[in-house]
Amino acid sequence: QIIQASAGMLPYVSNQPLRLSPSRVSEFENCPQLYKYRVIDQLPQPPSLDAERGTLVHTVLHDLFENAPTDRTPQSAIELLPSRWQAQMVEKPELMEMVTNEKEWFDRAESLLRTYFTLEDPQSFEATHRELHLENDFSEEIYLHGYVDRLDVAPTGEVRIVDYKTGKAPKPGWEEKALFQLRVYALLYFKTHNVLPRLLQLIYLGDGKVVKSTPTLSDLAATEKVLKRVASDIFASIEKDYWPPKPSRLCDWCYFKTICPAHNS
């Protein structure tokens, strides 16, 4: 399918602060051309079934903590799936046609939820914040923000930042790249509350693994340095209108491959 920009599409407004988030940083680092299509050109994309399943599981895990601790069980989580999926389809009616085998769809979501209960016991703690929006005016030119799946504050004050992933954990040696997202959240929390989070935790439901890290102030300083470098690179790309593609194995899953200059002479 050939994608064309709509004539009514909003242009990038250069006199507004650059909005940065972990996902936007990752997009630009992986492929500036993809960043341009999504952020600058604002080209529409159809929903991804994997992403929508992730949204469904995230919603159920969010709502699970509305229950009393004794009712935070695998069965009560699974019972939330149909109603949350209906709400998701109301928001995106096109999902109704995309999911051709609803039983298989629910079975996979149920499997991810059952895996969650092998990694944590949600009856044993209270989630202080869910879907917490952290933001900071990084500078006059940069607005940094992100949404934390869950943030727990212990009675003794220690802070744990948790992110659910419905995919598999990164291979050994690639954990640092995965943890960058949570280090950005830790930096945002530190800038807002002057408290250094005690633990960063990525929960991978695809293979039942957990990646943990204890951040330090030097970690946050290094993260801030990366953010400023990426922002500087984005501003340079905007000024030059230069968005070089970075061909990789990810291209086969990219919706914009048909219009990407790396794949079209």
What are these regions (language model features)?
Residues 15-16, 20, 36:
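An N-terminal structural lobe/cap that precedes and organizes the functional/catalytic core
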Residues 1-3, 7-10, 19, 75, ...:
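Metal-dependent nuclease catalytic regions and adjoining charged, substrate-binding loops involved
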Residues 60-130, 137:
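A non-catalytic, helix-rich entry segment at domain boundaries
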Residues 25-26, 30-70, 106-114, 127-132:
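Nuclease catalytic cores
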Residues 27-35, 52-56, 73-93, 195-205:
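Short, compositionally biased low-complexity segments
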Residues 34-41, 58-61, 88-91, 162-166, ...:
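Short acidic (Asp/Glu) and glycine-rich catalytic loops that position anionic groups and cofactors
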